[in-house]
Amino acid sequence: MHRTVLALSFMLLAGGLMLVAQTPSTDAPPQVHADMNQLMRGVLYPAANVVFSAQGDNPGDVKFVPGHDPNMSTDPLTSTFGGWQAVENAALALAESANLLSIAGRNCSNGVPAPTKDPAWTVFVQEVRDASMKSYRAAQAKDQDKMIETAETLSAACAGCHRKFRDRKAPENRCKVQ
């Protein structure tokens, strides 16, 4: 009996150690898979366009196209999760993307490291995050007037960062701290 308990204890301990060995470390730095240009074009730009579209078109008025499967729609507003929900989702994607903008190790398209440690970068990223969450709350409330205001705030946050870090005469100077 004693041997059985000892053997079972050993098996449980070994199994627990195997689980611990397979658990990803929380100390591992986030992996970067896209440069800044790819991140902007792939995530932030499309999501921002959904938020910006709510300035002129009420997402609640968007109609599904008869005969077209909303599961296959490439237009977020007419997809399965369309209308105001698409605007909510886009705003949340932008807010979460602010975290991606802060990850060290990401380069700009010209190979220059993104200036994640620059104080101005941190401010701009926080402005994007804040404006995105305001857009999310406006979309939840289905308040188009508030969407106009929050989209303008989001646009200003994006433009401020672009003026400082992107809009340079020579593309090789993008992301360089001046």
Q: Which residue ranges define each predicted feature?
A:
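Mature extracytoplasmic or organellar-lumen-exposed domains after removal of signal/transit peptides
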Residues: 23-178
